[in-house]
């Protein structure tokens, strides 16, 4: 099946698609950014102690740590 290119559609079809998308979006529940950002901040702060990117990975559990060295003589 060929890919759908919006620019190849007639104007009427483009407008139908836009109206359909807007009908979907109008049903979405929206929240204030100030409230959502506070919730996200709290979520991150509560879990930062468990985050390996913040806390780091213990040496004994680091799968990327070199196991040993190789000497070629």
Curated annotation (Swiss-Prot):
Gene Ontology MF terms in the entry: G-protein beta-subunit binding; GTPase activity
Cross-referenced Pfam families: G-gamma
Keywords of this entry: Cell membrane, Lipoprotein, Membrane, Methylation, Prenylation, Transducer
InterPro entries associated with the record: G-protein_gamma-like_dom, GGL_sf, Gprotein-gamma
One GO term (biological process): signal transduction
Tissues/organs with expression: Abundantly expressed in all tissues tested except for brain.
Protein location: Cell membrane
Keyword Cell membrane among UniProt keywords: yes
Lipidation (S-farnesyl cysteine): 70
Organism: Homo sapiens
Function in brief: Guanine nucleotide-binding proteins (G proteins) are involved as a modulator or transducer in various transmembrane signaling systems. The beta and gamma chains are required for the GTPase activity, for replacement of GDP by GTP, and for G protein-effector interaction.
Subunit structure of this chain's protein: G proteins are composed of 3 units, alpha, beta and gamma. Interacts with beta-1 and beta-3, but not with beta-2.
Membrane topology: Lipid-anchor
Modified residues (Cysteine methyl ester): 70
Name of this chain's protein: Guanine nucleotide-binding protein G(I)/G(S)/G(O) subunit gamma-11
Record keyword Cell membrane present: yes
Region (Disordered), start-end ranges: 51-73
One Gene Ontology cellular component annotation held by this UniProt entry: heterotrimeric G-protein complex
Similarity comment: Belongs to the G protein gamma family.
Gene encoding the protein: GNG11
